Amino acid sequence: MSEKIYDVPAEWAKRAFVDDAKYQEMYASSIRDPNGFWAEQAKRVDWIHAPTKIENVSYAPGNISIKWFEDGVLNAAYNCIDRHLATRADQTAIIWEGDDPADSKHITYRQLHDEVCKMANILRNRNVKKGDRVTIYLPMIPEAAYAMLACARIGAIHSVVFAGFSPDSLAQRIKDCDSKVVITADEGLRGGRKVPLKANVDAALNKVDNVDWVVVVKRTGGKIEMNPTRDLWYHEAAEMVTTECPVEHMNAEDALFILYTSGSTGQPKGVLHTTGGYLVYASMTHQYVFDYHEGDVYWCTADVGWVTGHSYILYGPLANGAVTLMFEGVPNYPDNSRFWNVIDKHKVNIFYTAPTAIRALMQGGDGPVTKTSRESLRLLGSVGEPINPEAWEWYHRVVGDNRCPIVDTWWQTETGGILITPLPGATRLKPGSATRPFFGVVPEIVDADGNTLEGATEGNLCLTRSWPGQMRTVYGDHARFEMTYFSTYKGKYFTGDGCRRDADGYYWITGRVDDVINVSGHRMGTAEVESALVAHPKVSEAAVVGYPHDIKGQGIYAYVTLMAGETPSEELRKELVGWVRKEIGPIASPDQIQFSQGLPKTRSGKIMRRILRKIAEDEPGALGDTSTLADPAVVDDLVQHRQNRKEKQA
């Protein structure tokens, strides 16, 4: 834990929306009178019918129900586009920066309106109605924003699938939410390489039969197959429709989107967010956490395939009339200066990225950063996983020239928006700490039995109060919603994260405590990777755990037992890595595979993951009690053949 403290720069305290006194006052008000507080915040969006009911929430076992602003009526796309046309039609809404540094464009709010209406009319003409699901499998191109906002405009529910997922993962997600339409591109571009998106969609649709239409955006012009009865080119369909499309009236509790996240059971969960509460919360957190002022150029480097892209590239910034940058590329293409060149090119003021990217660029040294100016920057942010103090210090010193505060934000797909975070004009910073709760958020640290722990302590992080951005259910499976988040500690939302609170009341996230690994800020269920490995004909059994990784935060460590007669080899190791890439996607590739004669199991057959974690972390002396194992000799073999020895890496 870092002992350093960075005070709020005086000029920040002066110009920010919130200084420390204001934070204390607003936070106290949000806890004392949540209905009054959130009724006031609800005014930041335009309502067709303003809500009179603010919060209606139950965390009671068997009756988990979350409703905010439930009698209000609005439209998210109207709030992100139309309401800005009177005052900023010609202001840039989206700066798009392509994979190729020579490829960029500015899209104004008026242009955004016209393009979204065209996409919405294409969908309406294909009989997409309010409540229908649309799967979006696109690269980071403007059409991804058009597609999401077009769905919001007509009341369809979008399900964005990250374009790095495999055909099998895509098929699973299309089937689970019963999508009528898939919107994709011929190919994606990433780091100079082509990604076969349409071919992946074709492969996925061989496994499902619920899709009527595939809308294809021409990105590269590469050769693809088109099914004449199902597939249509976006650019051709767009020529046949108008740039006007009336907005659907949406109840605040009507669904806005589904976003799949890894679960510990291996079956992805469709996290469902609704319209009113989500939009209010995304807008509010974007304004206060990033201290967004009119005219600022704001860049969140996430992909819209993840929740950070939903809340902090699209909905939050656009609801606030912001200039938001959308980046198709990767941090190290064409070289390690790419992020910093983009900041200089577009005069970016606020920069929000992941610790994984920071750590990877840090390995390339200071040179690629210091040869750029970055003088436009005034605020840095971190998201996706805890940031280690060394990376925090480098980010602050080298990228921010010791002058830009860092907002180290903690939240989840399920929370819709940021929950624990510094506010740049209000919060003294400690490297590695997410610091204090946002307005209305009440964290509680509990022990394994659910007892509340007070003061400076460490345990499991729960939240005792609801907030408007909270997910409402797991799509199609409310019982799973209750089981996953509310059954461990009754009457509380359990985050699945461990947490430490220091003597100053600052929160330090210590990582997942369930069977989910956080790889480069993206959650990956261990069961999902295990299922992929066991599907290989040569694999009898597999167990997957996380271990500390210098770049990714956590790496994937797989223990694999082979079928009788099969022999471990380097070739088979590579084959299994490729197999998992194909089954799930590159993000799930194991970093280490250890072939094992068996796995440590209790006499009842339960795998002792605690032991596997310690071996993967190269801590064989900390295995604890192994007497309950059916065959303790298995552990000796695993320790002897472990892949992640410190001396091996030296």
Curated annotation (Swiss-Prot):
Instruction: Fetch the InterPro entries from UniProt.
Output: Ac_CoA_lig, ACAS_N, AMP-bd_C, AMP-bd_C_sf, AMP-binding_CS, AMP-dep_synth/lig_dom, ANL_N_sf
Source organism per UniProt: Bradyrhizobium sp. (strain ORS 278)
- The residues that the entry says bind ATP are G384, E385, P386, D408, T409, W410, W411, Q412, T413, D497, R512, R523
Q: What is this protein called?
A: Acetyl-coenzyme A synthetase
- Positions that bind Mg(2+): V534, H536, V539
One of the protein's GO biological processes: acetyl-CoA biosynthetic process from acetate
What is stated as this protein's family in its record? Belongs to the ATP-dependent AMP-binding enzyme family.
Question: In what way is this protein post-translationally modified?
Answer: Acetylated. Deacetylation by the SIR2-homolog deacetylase activates the enzyme.
Q: Which domain of life is it from?
A: Bacteria
Q: What is its EC number?
A: 6.2.1.1
Picking any one GO molecular function of the record gives:
ATP binding
- Which cofactors is this protein said to need? Mg(2+)
**Gene3D superfamilies (UniProt xref):** 3.30.300.30, N-terminal domain of ligase-like
Give me the Gene Ontology terms describing cellular component.
cytosol
Residue positions, PTM N6-acetyllysine: K606
